[in-house]
Structure formats: structure tokens, C-alpha cells
Swiss-Prot record:
Belongs to the Mg-chelatase subunits D/I family. ComM subfamily. GO terms for molecular function: ATP binding; ATP hydrolysis activity. This is Uncharacterized protein YifB. SUPFAM superfamilies: P-loop containing nucleoside triphosphate hydrolases (SSF52540), Ribosomal protein S5 domain 2-like (SSF54211). It comes from Salmonella typhimurium (strain LT2 / SGSC1412 / ATCC 700720). PANTHER family: COMPETENCE PROTEIN COMM, MAGNESIUM-CHELATASE SUBUNIT CHLI.
Length: 506
């Protein structure tokens, strides 16, 4: 036949919309025309496919060839269309006799020798193909990724000849091996942190409720050390969460997908990171750090050193759990539900009081003004991590609880929240807060007076209630008490610091 149709998948974010490759061969001047909004990388496929077909022992048709990538309104880039184009060409030129092409989807880049190479986004393509009721053939390089989904419906191949022999029924293809869960890497333990008991308590509350945390203190007090221990007290990812995170990671770095399977992402971008690097972007938008941290932790060290517009761009994703990227050629939505952990010094010199302070209150306030009020409002807890008291380093005091012990309480708190409301406390919204964060009348009035004194917003009031609810869950209490509220209010270090500086300037 002179017309052949082969199915494949595009890669638009974590989605993999279906693409139909239509190849028509007719009489006329030899040449190849490709239509359907192909990018430069796709147009280059004509040369790769020609060499791959010839070096695989087939003939490249010396006729007029028209290739259509439908639908035409979807942008298409990368070498993922090489394999389906080559198979469609061979079928249209009657060098490949396969009657069951409709049952398969093909995704893979071709080398000039005909060898198959892996492509980004194989997890999304395989998931969507299986959901559509088709089998999918991918390169052996993608075997570890698709093996995370299911070996049913997936085939792996290493050469164009192998794929053609399989489609003709002459050769069997291997299925990807089901990937075993990678053994968890050794994480740093909370017992390594000397002192800072309030910081450890705040870290436990952060993990138990899925809250955002801001650590404030002089240099060298253990802020970064505490933040790096958070992943060690969080429960492992569920299979569904792990697949979501793996699908995003496979778009940028497929080699590490299997190694980090079911480990919560921990992203720590440098403070020089641009807006595009943080939220994602490009002509066809690629995921940024906030999407790569989906279901995990985004740690921002030296917070005031980030560009203000970069930090303010995080405000909407923190609330919605996703980021919408609109460009001329594509509009893509990436998931971005992460826990934001940040660390900062209270002043340019690292200290705002005591013998080490070399800044005036005006300089300190100007430094803190790099962070907008609405952005600081997104933190559920802000903790001061002070210098250790004299003698603590020389004393052989108890090192406190291990990460494993704290992790058990965190998992118990998670289970309690999911039984009660099907989500973590940090994700509670308006009416849910009214339903699950009920206060006694006297406690509600006390909290309102405290908010007025600290000058906090309605959003901060809601976040205080959610933190208090988490503290109650850790204590296995059904009702939020005054003690829980007082502890939640104690984790507002940034507000107390600003009030202190304003009093000095008054």
C-alpha cells in the first residue's frame, strides 16, 4: 500500500497526547515533505530516518513522500518520532507487511545505524498508551522507566530491524523487568544536630502537617543542617505519588528516575537561580525546580539573596499546587505541590543584636524588606535558630531522639489526618478549617487579640489554626486547646523580629 498510519505520543509537560504519523508515497519527483507543525529537531528526522533505513538493510523509497504529523495544532519536537516515521515509511513502501500496526504505539529516536535511543517522558507516553488500550514499543534505554509502571503492554527494542521483525511476527520482543524499589539511601539523622530542641520540634510539626517552614538565625547555628534532615522524618512516597514525581523527573533526567523511586524529592537551587529555572519555561515549557520538587521539599537557603520577583512567582503555586506556563506555541500545566523550607540570616551581617551586630535597625529592616509581605505570609511556621548557649558543646548531654523515632510520630499524625479529612492539615481550605479546627469561645477570642497585637492577616490566622491542629494531632488530641494555640503562635519569629525592629525605629 502507498499509505500507512502509525500511532505515537508527543511530550507536552507530563501529558502525552496521541499523535498519528501518516505517510503517503506517490509518483513524482523524489523528495520528502513533512507537515504538521514539526520543529527543527523533527525536520532533521528525514536525514536520520533515511540513514537508519538504509543501514538496517532496507531501501529508502525514491519517490515523492509526504509525512503528516496529526493533529497539526500540537507543537512537536525532539527525536521521539524517528521510529514511527521509519516504520510508517517501510509499511507504505510495502517493505514491511504488518497487519496489526493499529494495536501498537512507537516512541524512540533512531541512530544512523538503526539503533534505538531513549527519549524523555517515556513514563507519560507508556501510561497514556496503556490507558488507551494499546501496546507501546520503546527503546531499551527507557526500560527502567517504563518498568516502574507495568510490564504488561510495554515492549523494549534496541534496533529498527528488531521492531520490524516483531511487527511481522518473526521475532519476539522483551518486556521491561518490573523494577524493585531502590533501597533507601542513608539520610542524615536528627541526632547529629546539637541542641536546637525547638528547631527539632518545629521540624516535626512541619513534617506532620505538610507545612511551610522559615528558619531564621545567625550563621552556623544549624539551619541548613535541620532542613536537610526533614526528608529523613517524612514517610516514603506512595506508588501514585512516586509515579507522578518520576514522570516529571523523566522529562529532564531519566537516568536518576529509578535511583530515586519512592524517595521524596529534595531540591535546593542556588540563590542565583533565575525565574525560568525556578518555575519552568522555554518555547515549549520545561519543568522548573518547583515542579521537580513535586511531592517533596524545595529548600531555599540564603532566602533574601534570591531575586524578589523569583520568590513572588512562588506565591500562586504554593497555594494551588500547580504552575501554569503560557507561551505562544504551548500552554502547559505542571504539578507543583511541595513543602517550602527556607533559611535566612536576620541581617546582612548575620546578627541583629548582641556583640556581633554591625548593622543599624534601618539596615536590618531594609535587608528584610527584600522579602514581600505576601510571600512571608505563605510560611506556616517561622523559627529562630539562635546561637547555642555556652557549655553545650563541651557537655556530654543526650543527643535527643533519632529521625526514626520522630518519623513514627509523623506517620501516625499523617494517618490520623487522612482518616479524618482525607488530606494533610496544610491543605485544608476555608470551610474545612471551620469544620476541623474548632476552638472554644475563649480560645478564639485570645487568638484574635494575639493576631491584632502581631498585625497578622486572615491568611496567617488560618495558617495558625492549621499548625495548632497539627500539634493536637501529634499529641493525639481531638480538640485544639489553648496550649496548642500558644505553641503555634510561638512559631512566628519573623513577625516578632519585625515588631522589634519597628520599636527600635520608633
Amino acid at each position: 500500500m502507498s499509505l500507512a498510519i502509525v500511532h505515537t505520543r508527543a511530550a507536552l509537560g507530563v501529558n502525552a497526547p496521541p499523535i498519528t504519523i501518516e505517510v503517503h508515497i506517490s509518483n513524482g519527483l523524489p523528495g520528502l515533505t513533512m507537515v504538521g507543525l514539526p520543529e527543527t529537531t523533527v525536520k532533521e528526522a528525514r536525514d536520520r530516518v533515511r540513514s537508519a533505513i538504509i543501514n538496517s538493510g532496507y531501501e529508502f523509497p525514491a519517490k515523492k513522500i509526504t509525512i503528516n504529523l496529526a493533529p497539526a495544532d500540537l507543537p512537536k519536537e525532539g527525536g521521539r518520532y524517528d521510529l514511527p516515521i521509519a516504520v510508517a515509511l517501510l509499511a507504505a513502501s510495502e517493505q514491511l507487511t504488518a497487519s496489526n500496526l493499529e494495536a501498537y504505539e512507537l516512541v524512540g529516536e533512531l541512530a544512523l545505524t538503526g539503533a534505538l535511543r531513549g527519549v524523555p517522558g517515556a513514563i507519560s507516553s507508556a501510561t497514556e498508551a496503556i490507558r488507551a488500550g494499546r501496546n507501546i514499543i520503546v527503546a531499551t534505554e527507557n526500560a527502567a522507566e517504563v518498568g516502574l509502571i507495568s510490564k504488561e503492554g510495554c515492549f523494549i527494542a534496541d534496533h529498527l530491524q528488531t521492531v520490524c521483525a516483531f511487527l511481522e511476527g518473526k521475532h519476539a520482543l522483551e518486556r521491561p523487568l518490573a523494577q524493585d524499589m531502590a533501597s533507601p539511601t542513608a539520610t542524615a539523622d536528627l541526632r547529629d544536630v546539637i541542641g536546637q530542641e525547638q528547631g527539632k520540634r518545629g521540624l516535626e510539626i512541619t513534617a506532620a502537617g505538610g507545612h511551610n517552614l522559615l528558619l531564621i538565625g545567625p550563621p552556623g547555628t544549624g539551619k541548613t543542617m535541620l532542613a536537610s534532615r526533614l526528608s529523613g522524618i517524612l514517610p516514603p512516597l506512595s506508588n501514585e505519588e512516586a509515579l507522578e514525581s518520576a514522570a516529571i523527573l523523566s522529562l529532564v533526567n531519566a537516568d536518576t528516575v529509578q535511583k530515586r523511586w519512592q524517595q521524596r524529592p529534595f531540591r535546593s537551587p542556588h540563590h542565583s537561580a533565575s525565574l525560568t529555572a525556578m518555575v519552568g519555561g522555554g518555547a515549549i515549557p520545561a519543568p522548573g525546580e518547583i515542579s521537580l520538587a513535586h511531592n517533596g521539599i524545595l529548600f531555599l537557603d540564603e532566602l533574601p539573596e534570591f531575586e524578589r520577583r523569583t520568590l513572588d512567582a512562588l506565591r500562586e503555586p504554593i497555594e494551588s499546587g500547580q504552575i501554569h506556563l503560557s507561551r505562544t506555541r504551548a500552554k502547559i500545566t505542571y504539578p507543583a505541590r511541595f513543602q517550602l523550607i527556607a533559611a535566612m540570616n536576620p541581617s546582612p551581617t548575620g546578627h541583629y543584636q548582641g556583640n556581633h551586630n554591625r548593622c543599624t535597625p534601618e539596615q536590618t529592616l531594609r535587608y528584610l524588606n527584600r522579602l514581600s509581605g505576601p510571600f512571608l505570609d505563605r510560611f506556616d511556621l517561622s523559627l529562630e535558630i539562635p546561637l547555642p548557649p555556652p557549655g553545650i558543646l563541651s557537655q556530654h548531654a543526650s543527643k535527643g531522639e533519632s529521625s526514626a523515632t520522630v518519623k513514627k510520630r509523623v506517620i501516625a499524625a499523617h494517618e490520623r489526618q487522612y482518616r479524618r479529612q482525607k488530606k494533610l492539615n496544610a491543605r485544608l481550605e476555608g470551610r474545612e478549617i471551620q469544620k476541623y479546627c474548632v476552638l472554644h469561645h475563649d480560645d478564639a477570642r485570645w487568638l484574635e487579640d494575639t493576631l491584632v497585637h502581631l498585625g497578622l492577616s486572615i491568611r496567617a490566622w488560618q495558617r495558625l489554626l492549621k499548625v495548632a491542629r497539627t500539634i493536637a494531632d501529634i499529641e493525639l488530641a481531638d480538640q485544639i486547646s489553648r496550649q496548642h494555640l500558644q505553641e503555634a503562635v510561638s512559631y512566628r519569629a519573623i513577625d516578632r523580629l519585625l515588631i522589634h525592629l519597628q520599636k527600635l525605629l520608633a
